[in-house]
Amino acid sequence: MEVIHAWSAPRSLSTTLMYSFAQRDDIEVLDEPLYAAFLKSTGVDRPYKDELLSKMECDGEKVVKDIIYGPGKKKYRFCKHISKQRLLGLPSELMSEGKHFILIRNPLNILPSFEKIHPSSFHELGLGELVSIYSDLCQMGTPPAIIDADELQRDPEATLRSLCDDLEIPFQASMLKWEAGPIPEDGLWAPWWYETLHKSTGFSSPQKYPQTFPLMHYDLLEQCLPLYNILRCHMKHKSSLLSSTLPPPSLPVPENAKLLAWVGDEIVPREMAKVSVFDSVVQGGDSVWEGLRIYKGKVFKLEEHLDRLSDSAKALAFNNVPTREEIKEAIFRTLITNGMFDNTHIRLSLTRGKKVTSGMSPAFNRYGCTLIVLAEWKPPVYDNDGGIVLVTATTRRNSPNNLDSKIHHNNLLNNILAKIESNNANVDDAIMLDKDGFVSETNATNIFMVKKDRVLTPHADYCLPGITRATVMELVVKENFILEERRISLSEFHTADEVWTTGTMGELSPVVKIDGRVIGEGKVGPVTRRLQNAYKKLTDGSGVPIPTYQEVKNLEPCV
């Protein structure tokens, strides 16, 4: 006989699920076989305690060996367990043998239901024990399947089919319906807990609208919800109130699935890296940011990026801004914790911070700024060998009359609208013109061109004066090319000998076609290649060292 263990918190539809499995012709079920041992060991009081202790086996070791794993008449045995009933000292085979899965339910739905029967507490809900069960099973090399009670209610057949697949047992349609009333396998506590279930004949549809949440449980909800979310993020099929929820996509760099990010004043795992819905970046894109690259244990142009971040924050009148040293420490700690010392890009963001209430006014921002350090394994995002293709967007670059591009702000809709045009054209990026029709930059980068050995780039009146742009301009002079900064028409770019773009994310990227016109010979030109080499030499040899890098510099790169 194969034993199936179902672990859950109370009021999670665990008994409903037990009724479902009891309808199968190949399974016998046990209703909380460890309950009496739990009550005897802990001294927890229940109105039926004395009767329970007199009728059920109270010795946990005997329960495991003689009842849970004892002989049976059917192919499978389904054991419904409440997580807190897994006591210390129980035989190890309880967890090491059989098949296990975890049933979770949002504490928002558990707490109002639980209170009707018994006073709720963190211990009574048992979510901490449920996380511990998951962790122990993972350490044994047998991570359990996780299903959500809310999804079980919304689509019982699909959820049960998926669960049966995980348990490697055939699905039976009989699991979806049963006769009203008790079943012989009910625990003797059924009159206290199962009244509603006894009126059912199957999985009831979830209520369209939830109950009003009792504020007396607000603190308990704050304690329990993170544990529920820890388990929920390990579900294969996450439940959602939105029918349009998409399956999880693949990542461009799979190693980034398990990165750590700095948010506020702490480092947290990727799935926990979130800001408040009251944060100004959510309320209005009210934030500034920088992109930085890491080369061979050094942060390239760190001081220049921090200068611009500070200038942008000052231009937007941010208050309670972290100090320069605090920002550096957050950057270094994030990189070191992730083991990222090369081939890494950082998205450094500073929001105006959380508001006391929703609204536009910065007067509502009374918590101080929110610092975010998002470091990812990320090679240059463009094809810097074969070249990229651009189109010209109909969306014009913001004028300083409206929003000064010298403020490196997070309100990027102007750029995003142009990027949508390039996506629709199936090319890499879009050139954006200023209000008079001259080239400003692309949606993501600054832009340069070569004509008769002269290097030209648009002036910075309508574009972000990029740090990579400034670096390349210095290299142009050092490489003894003539540099000219002026207004440049689109037709001049169409007829250029060479074109390239610059940015921290993509470095120096050759452009081989614009609006269907081949640039030069349609490949990387000699000036572009020479400047690429000079840029690589510069990034290899300069930057602010990351503390501790010398200790690990001989390790192989992670990607």
Swiss-Prot record:
Pfam families in the record: Aminotran_4, Sulfotransfer_5
Transmembrane segments: none
GO biological process: carboxylic acid biosynthetic process
Single GO MF annotation: catalytic activity
InterPro entries: Aminotrans_IV, Aminotransferase-like, BCAT-like_C, BCAT-like_N, Class-IV_PLP-Dep_Aminotrnsfr, P-loop_NTPase
PANTHER family (UniProt xref): AMINO-ACID AMINOTRANSFERASE, BRANCHED-CHAIN-AMINO-ACID AMINOTRANSFERASE-LIKE PROTEIN 2
Family as reported in the entry's similarity comment: Belongs to the class-IV pyridoxal-phosphate-dependent aminotransferase family.
UniProt name for this protein: Branched-chain-amino-acid aminotransferase-like protein 2
Upper taxonomic lineage: Eukaryota, Viridiplantae, Streptophyta, Embryophyta, Tracheophyta
